[in-house]
From Swiss-Prot:
Pfam family membership, one: Methyltransf_3
Gene Ontology cellular-component annotations: apical part of cell; cytoplasm; endoplasmic reticulum
Protein name: Transmembrane O-methyltransferase homolog
GO biological process, one term: developmental process
Organism: Rattus norvegicus (Rat)
Lineage start: Eukaryota, Metazoa, Chordata, Craniata, Vertebrata
Length: 258
């Protein structure tokens, strides 16, 4: 490319960098720096986060563990977790619905799992599914460190596509009063339809889906609005530590087959 052509594109490049500067910062923190630290330490980000938690958080205090994870994500390495603002929305909805049984798809480091478990009424049960075995091992430690036993919070390592059909037979889950989709948005529609197909959603069940605006789940949103089985509401929010990057949590109420 000649210098003249390169100069012609310079204003466009500068404009894009300015407009998407927050997205560029996010890319640097979540991809470039994370990959570098993974190679340098031989540990994944979730494992490094747990090393910080185990030395700074109070065992048996889920609130303090959550605050410790927030601090580590803001000051050390960006964790790509739900964060305190979305977390308040999640806890409020769990407290309002008071579900007897909750299914979470996408445990990650256990952050949202602790939020749900804190807000559940006595006697309720939470099943959380994490595809990656190393991440699941970290989340298991976080959950137990917070003081939640296996009777209340059961972690299942495996892909949601394989786990959902086995929930009734292998994990005695006959119905999920509340479901949190917090794994990869491209799988939201597939997994929602699996839950429908296996009759795991009772009438009035609540389905919450994170990251429906960023990175986005357009096919999932289109389906839930057009299939006639859900009442839909969107809670507008943003990414933790990146208030300029807008996101949202979809709240669905299952009304039965259309």
């Amino acid at each position: 490319m000649s210098p003249a052509i390169a100069l012609a594109f310079l204003p466009l490049v500068v404009t894009l960098l300015v407009r998407y500067r927050h997205h560029f910062r996010l890319l640097v923190r979540t991809v470039l720096l994370r990959s570098f630290r993974d190679c340098l330490s031989g540990l994944r980000i979730e494992e490094r986060a747990f090393s910080y938690v185990i030395t700074h958080a109070l065992p048996g205090d889920p609130g303090h563990i959550l605050t410790t994870l927030d601090h580590w994500s803001s000051c050390c390495e960006y964790l790509s977790h739900m964060g305190p603002i979305k977390g308040q929305i999640l806890m409020r909805l769990v407290e309002e619905k008071a579900p007897a049984c909750v299914l979470e798809l996408g445990t990650h480091c256990g952050y949202s799992t602790l939020l749900i478990a804190r807000a559940l009424p006595p006697g309720s049960r939470l099943l959380t599914v994490e595809r990656d075995s190393r991440t699941a091992a970290v989340a298991e430690k976080v959950i137990r460190l917070a003081g939640f036993d296996e009777q209340m919070v059961e972690l299942i390592a495996g892909s949601s596509e394989e786990v959902i059909p086995r929930l009734r037979a292998q994990h005695q889950l006959n119905r999920a009063d509340l479901v949190l989709l917090a794994h990869r948005p491209r799988y939201y529609l597939r997994d929602l339809q699996l839950l429908e197909a296996h009759a795991l959603l009772p009438h009035g069940a609540t389905v919450l889906a994170d990251h429906v605006l960023f990175p986005g789940a357009p096919r999932f949103l289109q389906y839930t609005k057009s299939c006639g089985r859900y009442r839909c509401r969107l809670h507008h929010t943003s990414l933790p530590d990146f208030p300029a990057i807008k996101d949202g949590i979809a709240q669905l109420t299952y009304t039965g087959p259309g």
